[in-house]
Amino acid sequence: MVLDFGARAQDFLKRITTLSADLAAHGRTRALALQKLHRLCQAEVRRLKTRYTLATVKLALSKYRNAIRAVEPDHLVLRPRKMRSGQRFSYLALEPEETRSLNAAYHERIHRDQSNLIPLDPEAFIQTALELLASDRYLQKGMGLMALTGRRPAEIFFSASFSLPKKKLPYPAVIFDGQLKTRQAPGTSFEPYPIPVLADPKKLIQALDRLRSLKSFPSPEAVNTTTGPQLPKYVSAAFGSLELPWKPGHLRSAYGAICCHKFKPKNQTDDIFLAQILGHKLLGPNASLSVGQSYKDFYISKV
């Protein structure tokens, strides 16, 4: 099931907006407004926890913060606070021990996955992706673009735009604009950047234009709600097998593995190159290398 927290986030935003004037005041008025804001946030987090797993709640709270940030980038909800005990907390986040538990589970999964990599035949992968690209069914064409450019579903179906580089690069490339999941953190960049591609760049630009004419979406959430239930079975049918079923995220991982194999400069590690081509470099140095660990699912088995 694909969950869309956009509407709930907007409803929560309306509820805390009524406090804006008092939060901008001074003295007792501001103190009381801060207390009410804290109670509203705590109640919303508790409500989410009764319905969803911690991982899903963490995702939902990220949606809430993004909705607030889009309207008021400096809202107090977004600022870390300090208790009298000295402990730091956020109005709209999980408890520190809950976050640590999720992070531990994440690192355990990464260790397990990287201890059992999936073999990948680059030529077979690219050929399958090109066949999908030639389809006039929007989901198949989108899968082809995802595989050949390494972009996420919501980027391919909604936010991405491709253009040709002005200068020749050492690999086939397009300039990609429309990166999602940048976390909107301090130091984050939103600039378009070059990405290597696994097919003719002009062909990919034309395919993206054709895809948008086949079907358009109003938002990333609409993409995830519509394509989320279908993509796993279609991706696995096209690229996986009964023994090794594929997930949509594997397309991005396979793209990264092939690009490292074909295009990575010899004086760079895989981590640095992946951070560049997957857009993790935009997150800033603290997050860029760690995020790339989620995309190391394959090893090149044939050349």
Q: What are these regions, as identified by a protein language model?
A:
Residues 143, 157, 232-240, 256-263, ...:
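Hydrophobic transmembrane helix bundles of membrane-integrated enzymes that assemble
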Residues 196-255, 260:
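Active-site/catalytic core of tyrosine-dependent DNA strand-transfer enzymes
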Residues 144, 246-283:
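C-terminal catalytic core of tyrosine-transesterase DNA break-rejoin enzymes
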Residues 264, 276-303:
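Catalytic-site neighborhood detector that most strongly recognizes the C-terminal catalytic loop/helix
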Residues 158-203:
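Conserved tyrosine-mediated DNA breakage-rejoining catalytic core shared by Y-recombinases
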Residues 118-149, 153:
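Basic, Lys/Arg- and aromatic-enriched nucleic-acid-binding interface segment
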Residues 1-93, 156, 249-250, 254, ...:
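Non-catalytic DNA-binding core/recognition domains of DNA-processing enzymes
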Residues 76-124:
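Flexible interdomain linker/hinge and immediately adjacent N-terminus
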